[in-house]
UniProtKB/Swiss-Prot annotation:
Molecular functions (GO terms): 5'-flap endonuclease activity
Pfam annotation, one family: Slx4
Compositional bias (Basic and acidic residues): 58-72
Lineage: Eukaryota, Fungi, Dikarya, Ascomycota, Pezizomycotina
Organism: Paracoccidioides brasiliensis (strain Pb03)
Record's compositionally biased regions (Basic residues): 307-317
Biased composition (Low complexity): 35-54, 683-695
Chain's role: Regulatory subunit of the SLX1-SLX4 structure-specific endonuclease that resolves DNA secondary structures generated during DNA repair and recombination. Has endonuclease activity towards branched DNA substrates, introducing single-strand cuts in duplex DNA close to junctions with ss-DNA.
GO cellular component terms, semicolon-separated: Slx1-Slx4 complex
Gene symbol of the encoding locus: SLX4
Designated name of the protein: Structure-specific endonuclease subunit SLX4
Residue ranges of the region described as Disordered: 35-72, 89-113, 160-193, 288-318, 348-382, 413-432, 625-771
């Protein structure tokens, strides 16, 4: 461009020289201006450019740029001019100016065709751009390219004449997208500073590795203060995000904050978010989004979280119960209330003071006064605890003095502690006995509520807990019908005991033939429960153990009442007579009283009132029917007495009339033993014993008599019983057939005859001086001499077998003791395998039964 000085002293451009980059100097042509105050016309510019470009300026780098396939930054000369013009695109055909449009003029040449373009951009710059199309441009469609993808651009700026024209290269960059705000910065430097502050390059690379969490904050419109711009919101949002993420950093203190629960507003979202973030968001919503307020909130939150951490570091939380001992002793420990209040309990409280504390939970004032809350707990700690875990030695001492209750969990859980203890205590006294001792009315009445509370379950019987009590029930668990008790009334009339005189011994039966030996007819013989004596007369709480042993002595009852027994046999009991009481009117009782009365008799609760009245009337009649008062039995205990009375009747066929001291006038007829008990006890057949000598019989009659009840089951349950004596053998003068037809009678001593298992009645002085059979068995085994070898094989003695832990056959040892062992030591009594088993178990001797013990008897026959 050439400059000329005008008359008024201003400089103007007289010509414009176009400079094409990467071209030879000859390519630059000058455009003469018609007037110093006007720019060249578009037509002249187009004509000049078309002629200059048709000459083919050298562009060696065009093909290279195209082959590289990358965006090339163009450097353009800037032409300055003093006149400011609007953006114009000058067309070469009509010379019309249209704003915002581009016009291209195409000049065709055989080998080198170019396109020239003039574009006036804001800032009074003229852009002269030349493009060369490809060789196959005619065949391909021309596509419009964006500004950033143009090959070459020439920027020209028209400035005043006094300014110098400067050619400066400029690197084009894509303008960054700023904030969508109404006010944009006027200079590009401010935008560059904003871009540098955002650090988009680092953010892009960081985004490839990690995607930040989605911002779920609730926008809050602050109507009080001026709303900040969107740029300020974005900057403050970035700072708040960094603050939130900083809460996840490890603080170096192990422990959880006491107030980790945050009480958010009811309108807060229900999404799962970290508790710390919820707390910070609530503070941000309240205080706003300004930088100064956000910094103060951060300081408050840090100070609030630092205080409870120090408190929790000093007082760590208690460890959970993780051991068996901790679980066992948990119910004895004193529960201490925690220092931190539960937010739910605080919100539900009606006190206004507590509601004020709830509003201050989000700030540090919550932990400002923990001392007042701690004082309440320290006062409780000073009080002595109700239960405390004692050392093991003291625990063992306390365990020794503790009364233990044994039973299944259902029994211990359903029963009351006091009643259960009384029942267990009463049951332990009569556990070794088979007879039933009814409880008093007071005790039965006290236990009635616990019995009725079980509902449909089994009734907790007030009688002894034995198998015969359970056998008195049907398959549904109900007590046997009462009619079975009344079936036996026909043979136990008052006239039998009162009006009939004593009959001479040896009277034969007229109408009924007894069954064979060892059998009992249950169809024709049924026992009626004896009339009950008042329970307080039988059982008292102050009885000594020696007295309790004599409580279960009952009279052997006959199983068949025939003409002989009705005419000649009678039973007299030494207990005093009771006056007959008036029959109470049970219909006037209430239902609860009737239930107590029924429970007092040991029956299951009955729902019907009429059935209870009928049952009580029958029970009262049975008690007061006879003048002789004898104990009343329940159906289960009645079966027990039948069984045990028949078990002990091995005495009957083998006793001689003169073998028992005649100190009483009471006579009892013979009772047939049970068939099943005969098998288990092995009652010897009299015909086999008929070969015994009179000398042995005379010697046996001098020893005191006792009833023996020993079988396999009885020996298992009673380990502390005294060995009984051997049943007596009959004399030669009496044949077995005569004994079957003639009921033997014998005189009883003043005390009732004992039917207890393995016990000898203390009626004579001779039985007290006799040593126990256990010591006699030991003496007999040790007194056995050595045996001679048989066929070169040594025969060990019983003592040597025991020392070598050889299994001892109980039947063989019992036979040896009865034949050879007791004769060496002068013992006249005999033992059964059941008693030998008890001795073996007490001495720790290995003993076994024979394989055929179900066929053979427990008490085998012993030859004299």
């Amino acid at each position: 461009m050439t400059r000329q000085l005008s008359s008024d002293g201003r400089m103007f451009a007289s010509s414009i020289i176009t400079v094409i980059p990467d071209s030879s100097p000859t390519a630059a042509e000058a455009i003469e201006l018609s007037s110093p105050l006007s720019l060249p016309s578009p037509t002249s510019l187009l004509d000049f450019l078309s002629t200059s470009t048709s000459r083919g300026p050298a562009r060696s780098d065009t093909d290279g740029d195209k082959t590289q396939g990358k965006e090339v930054l163009d450097t353009r000369p800037i032409l300055e001019n003093s006149f400011r013009r609007e953006n114009r695109v000058v067309s070469g055909t009509g010379g019309k100016a249209a704003t915002g449009k581009k016009l291209k003029r195409r000049t065709e040449s055989p080998g080198n065709a170019c396109q020239s373009e003039i574009h006036i951009v804001p800032g009074e710059r003229i852009i002269l751009r030349q493009t060369r199309p490809d060789k196959k441009a005619a065949k391909t469609k021309r596509t419009k390219k964006e500004d950033g993808l143009m090959n070459r651009k020439l920027y020209g700026r028209v400035s005043k004449a006094n300014q110098t024209v400067s050619l400066q290269p400029e690197t084009k960059k894509s303008a960054p997208k700023g904030c969508n705000d109404t006010t944009q910065p006027a200079e590009n430097g401010h935008i560059n500073d904003l871009d540098d502050g955002l650090q988009l390059e680092q953010a892009i690379q960081r985004r490839l590795d990690w995607t930040p969490t989605k911002d779920t904050t609730i926008p809050v419109i602050d109507l009080v203060g001026d709303s900040p711009s969107s740029c300020e919101k974005s900057l403050s949002g970035m700072r708040s995000t960094r603050t939130m993420l900083s809460n996840y950093e490890f603080s170096g203190i192990v422990g959880t904050l006491g107030g980790s629960r945050s009480e958010g507003t009811p309108d807060a979202p229900t999404t799962k978010r970290p508790v710390e973030l919820l707390k910070v968001n609530n503070l941000k919503e309240i205080s706003g989004l300004s930088d100064s307020r956000q910094s103060s909130i951060t300081e408050d939150s840090e100070s609030a979280t630092s205080k409870p951490r120090r408190v929790k570091a000093k007082n760590p939380p208690k460890s959970k119960l993780t051991t068996i001992t901790s679980y066992a002793t948990a119910k004895y420990t004193v529960v201490e209330k925690s220092v931190d209040l539960d937010p739910v309990e605080t919100l539900l409280s009606d006190e206004p003071g507590k509601e004020k504390n709830v509003a201050k939970r989000t700030s540090g004032a919550r932990y400002a006064k923990p001392g007042r809350k701690k004082s309440a707990t320290t006062e409780k700690k000073n009080e002595p605890p109700i239960f405390k875990v004692v050392p093991p030695l003291e625990a063992f001492k306390a365990f020794d003095g503790q009364e233990l209750l044994f039973g299944t969990s259902s029994q211990l859980a359903n029963g009351h502690s006091e009643d259960q203890h009384e029942q267990n205590e009463g049951t332990s006294h009569i556990s070794n006995s088979s007879a039933f001792i009814p409880l008093s009315r007071s005790e039965s009445s006290s236990k009635a509520p616990s019995q009725t509370s079980l509902g449909s379950g089994f009734l907790k019987l007030s009688s002894s807990k034995n198998l015969w009590s359970a056998g008195a029930r049907d398959l549904t668990g109900a007590v046997l019908e009462i009619d079975e008790i009344d079936l036996s009334e026909h043979w136990m009339k008052p006239s039998i005991f009162e009006s009939q005189p004593k009959a001479p011994l040896g009277c034969k039966a007229d109408t009924q033939i007894p069954p064979q030996l060892g059998e009992i007819d249950f169809d024709n013989s049924c026992q009626k429960p004896l009339a009950a004596i008042d329970p307080p007369e039988l059982v008292t709480q102050s009885e000594t153990p020696s007295e309790k042993g004599d409580l279960h002595k009952y009279i052997v009852k006959p199983t068949h009442i025939n003409s002989c027994s009705q005419s000649g046999s009678s039973i007299s009991v030494g207990s005093p007579e009771k006056p007959v009481q008036d029959k109470p009117i049970f219909s006037g009782f209430t239902t609860s009283e009737l239930a107590k009365k029924v429970a007092a008799y040991g029956f299951k609760p009955i729902k019907s009132r009429d059935k209870m009245i009928a049952l009580l009337e029958k029970c009262w009649e049975n008690r007061n029917k006879t003048s002789n008062s004898v104990p009343k039995l329940t159906p289960g205990d009645r079966l027990s007495q039948v069984d045990e009375s028949t078990q002990g009747q091995s005495l009957g066929p083998h006793l001689k009339p003169n073998s028992i001291p005649q100190t009483a006038t009471t006579q009892v007829p013979k009772v047939k033993p049970d068939k099943r008990d005969t098998k288990s006890q092995g009652v010897p057949v009299p015909s086999r014993r008929s070969t015994s000598t009179s000398k042995v019989s005379r010697k046996r009659t001098e020893s005191p008599s006792a009833i023996l009840v020993d079988d396999d089951q009885r020996s298992d349950s009673t380990g502390d019983s005294v060995p009984p004596s051997r049943p007596r053998r009959p004399s030669k003068s009496c044949t077995p057939r005569d004994r079957q037809k003639t009921p033997e009678s014998f005189n009883l001593p003043t005390t009732p005859l004992t039917i207890r298992s393995g016990k000898i009645p203390s009626t004579g002085t001779a039985s007290e001086t006799l040593p126990s059979l256990s010591t006699q068995i030991t003496a007999a085994i040790k007194a056995q001499p050595r045996l001679r070898a048989f066929n070169g094989v040594k025969q060990p003695t019983w003592y040597e077998k025991i020392l070598m832990y050889d299994p001892i056959q109980l039947e063989d040892l019992a036979v040896w003791l009865n034949t050879d062992g007791f004769e060496r030591i002068g013992e006249d009594r005999e033992v059964c395998p059941g008693l030998v088993r008890e001795w073996c178990e007490s001495k720790g001797v290995c003993c076994i039964w024979r394989k055929q013990r179900g066929v053979r008897a427990h008490c085998p026959l012993v030859r004299a």
